[in-house]
Amino acid sequence: MSGRGKQGGKARAKAKTRSSRAGLQFPVGRVHRLLRKGNYSERVGAGAPVYLAAVLEYLTAEILELAANAARDNKKTRIIPRHLQLAIRNDEELNKLLGRVTIAQGGVLPNIQAVLLPKKTESHHKPKGK
C-alpha cells in the first residue's frame, strides 16, 4: 500500500482574504505589510490594517462620488483631475483635510471678488410724479 499518499482527512478550506472577511475592496494584507515595513512602530496589531484600509476606502469612495457628480454636471462621462479638484474644494471637510494638497492639472475654483463685479443699475422706467 505504499505510494498511495494520504487517504481521507479534512480537505483544506478555500483561502479567504482579510479584505473579503472585512467586506472591503482595499487590500488589508498590503496595508499590513506597508505598516510593518514603514517603521511606524515595532509591532502592528491585527485590527489596525483593517481599520486603516476601511478609512482609506471610505475616503476614496467619498471623493470619487463627488468627482463623478462634478463630471456629470459638466456633461462628461470620464473623471479628470479637474473634477477631483472641484469635488474636493467645494466640500468643506475634504478641503480642510486636503488643504495643503496640489492636484496636477486641477485648475482653480472660479471666484470673482464682489467689488470687481459691475454695479447694479436702477431700472430706466422711473415713475414721474407731480
Curated annotation (Swiss-Prot):
Residues with PTM N6-glutaryllysine: K96, K119, K120, K126
GO cellular component, one term: nucleosome
Organism superkingdom: Eukaryota
Pfam family, one: Histone_H2A_C
InterPro entries in alphabetical order: Histone-fold, Histone_H2A, Histone_H2A/H2B/H3, Histone_H2A_C, Histone_H2A_CS
Modified residues (N6-(beta-hydroxybutyryl)lysine): K37
Glycyl lysine isopeptide (Lys-Gly) (interchain with G-Cter in ubiquitin) cross-link, chain position(s): K120
CDD domains from the UniProt entry: HFD_H2A
Basic residues: bias regions: 7-19
PTM annotation, UniProt: Deiminated on Arg-4 in granulocytes upon calcium entry.
UniProt name for this protein: Histone H2A type 1-F
